[in-house]
Amino acid sequence: MNINATLLGQAISFALFVWFCMKYVWPPLMQAIEERQKKIADGLQAAERAAKDLDLAQANASDQLKEAKRTATEIIEQANKRKSQIIDEAREEAQAERQKILAQAEAELEAERNRARDELRKQVATLAVAGAEKILERTIDKDAQKDILDNITAKL
């Protein structure tokens, strides 16, 4: 094999080229590749975190929805209980008012009945005195008449 200057020059040039590439070209390429690998790994981690966060958010939303439904059910139950309580109170108040009105009407009726009895007693006494006057054919003075009327009224 014949080694001449051209081959030696090519070998030196190739060695210089390899050294130059290793010194100046290779590090930026490796850095770019490493940065790209890091970005891809970070992107995959972010996607995994996002998927976990989505699952967690869906679970939280489901829990909140269940809690809201439970709260709504409780509020409806409380409203129904309050409604029943208000109806019962109104019914009791109406019953009490009814009893009050009936008692008042009964008292008024009794008072009217007593007044009518007293009036009838007075009329009967007046008629009795008038009849007695005619029978006796004399007039009784007012004081004596009043005493007689009161006496008769008390007896009736």
From Swiss-Prot:
It is found in: Cell inner membrane. Its main location: membrane. Signal peptide: none annotated. One of its GO terms (cellular component) is plasma membrane. Keywords: ATP synthesis, Cell inner membrane, Cell membrane, CF(0), Hydrogen ion transport, Ion transport, Membrane, Transmembrane, Transmembrane helix, Transport. Belongs to the ATPase B chain family. This is ATP synthase subunit b. It comes from Vibrio parahaemolyticus serotype O3:K6 (strain RIMD 2210633).
